[in-house]
Amino acid sequence: MAEPALGFIGIGKMGLPMTVRLLAAGYRVTAFNRTPARLQAVRDAGAEVADSPAAVAARADIVFLCLTDTQAVEDVAFGEVGVGAGGSAGKLLVDCSSISPEATRRMADRLAATAGMRWMDAPVSGGVEGARRGTLIFMCGGESDEVERVRPVLGCLGQRATHIGPVGSGQAAKLCNQAIVSCNLAAIAEVINLARRAGLGEARLPQALAGGFADSLPLQIYGPRMAVPAVGEPLGEVATMMKDVANVLELARSLGASMPMTAAAEDLYRRTADLGYRHGDLETLMRLYDR
C-alpha cells in the first residue's frame, strides 16, 4: 500500500519538529502556516508549501493540525479557504491541538456534513523536546479504523498512541493531563522558592529528588529553569497553560466535578500573567515569589 500524502497546518514550536520528523521518515508533506516566514524551515527540509488550508487538504490524504486554540482550529477547518473547502470523502483530519472536547465533537460533525471528511482528535503530551526526539504520546479520539489508519504515521512522532474512545475523548484525556501538569508546575515553583529560602541550593534539588516519589518530567525540565532563570529556549507559554486550564475547569463545571487544586493553579497562572508574563515561559511562575 502506498504511503499516504500528508498535510501539516501550524508550523509552530510543536508543529515544526513534528513536520521535520515526518519528512525525515520519507512522507510527502504539504505545509501551511498563517505566518509564511515560519514555513522556510520545513521547505528547506523538503516540504511542499501551500497557500491555504484548502490547498493542503486538496493534496493530502491525512491533514494534521497543531494550532493554538479552539478558535484557530475552527478558522482553519471552516474558513473560506479552510480544510473543508479542499477536503473530500475519504480524507482524514487529525487535530493535535489542545482544545475543547465539546467543540471538537461539534466540528467533527460539521466537517463530515460539509466535506465528507472524518475527524480524529490526537492531542499530544511530551513538549517541544518530545516532538524533536519523537517521544510524544498521543491521546486519540475517533473511530478505531481511523486510529489504525494513522498509527504508522504517529509512530514516527511518538512512543505511544492510545485510543481513548470516540471523537472528543482524546481532548478530554489531554485536559486530565493538563490538570496534573498545571498543578505540578505550580507546586514545583513553590518548592524551588522554599528550597531557596531554606538555603538548600535549589539548583540541585531536582537531582536530589530524581527517582523518588516526588520526581517527574516537569520537575527535571522546569526545576532547573526555575532555579536559574533564562536557561534555554522557551518551552511553553503561560497563556497556553491558562487556555488549557480554563478548558479543564469548563469541562469540570459541565460535569459537576470539583477541582479545587486546578482552580488554585489557575489563579497562580492568572497572577503570573498579570505581572506581565502572559507570553513568558512557564518558569516565570517563579516571579510570584520575588517579593
Question: What is the predicted role of each segment?
Answer:
Residues 14, 18, 66, 96, ...:
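Methionine-biased hydrophobic packing positions in alpha-helices, especially
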Residues 98-178:
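Rossmann-fold dinucleotide-binding core
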Residues 53-118:
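Rossmann-fold NAD(P) dinucleotide-binding segment
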Residues 18-19, 107, 153, 194:
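Hydrophobic residues within alpha-helices
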Residues 169-291:
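Helical "substrate-binding/catalytic lid" subdomain
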Residues 35, 69, 143:
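Residues in the short beta-alpha loop(s) of Rossmann-like NAD(P)-binding domains
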Residues 1-65, 91, 96-97, 128, ...:
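NAD(P)+-binding Rossmann beta1-loop-alpha1 motif at the extreme N-terminus of oxidoreductases
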